């Protein structure tokens, strides 16, 4: 029970500042307080937006762009509420641009546009939904990649490091990959680096090259 309570407190802590709906279940005039249910409000919203109307159509369906509320944010995910259904959007679905930390771009209480990619309905209490943000924002990487020249030197920020491969977001709006670093210091996440392009990978829309030096370490 203690573990469950800790988990619930953690979830509530992460949701501080979130905008939520609730149905009032009771009022105590003496203590000037109300008892309310978020769960009931979410079920009501699900009935309105997900279940088919008299014409057999649903307001929230695959392919539709809708507004979602941001209710929690972590480094690699943004938790949203989409008309009574919660869904955590992974960083890879937030933007075509490589993102090191979602908390720098998204905040609890934000309202964002998402595209519904799938809806699964078994009953009003059992609805799951998937959505992304990047298809709404569009992809500028292809256009920006044309600004890159082989042997060109650009400044960027390290978004991630995985198995020796360094992922960089260049300031000119291009995703880049480096397999080697010529600075004596080890590169780290969020470091600002100078990147030299050795080739352009048009298929994957990335610049490939090396880190010539670390301009500013994220300490």
Question: What is the predicted role of each segment?
Answer:
Residues 1-219:
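Single-stranded RNA-binding regions, centering on S1/OB-family and related RNA-binding modules
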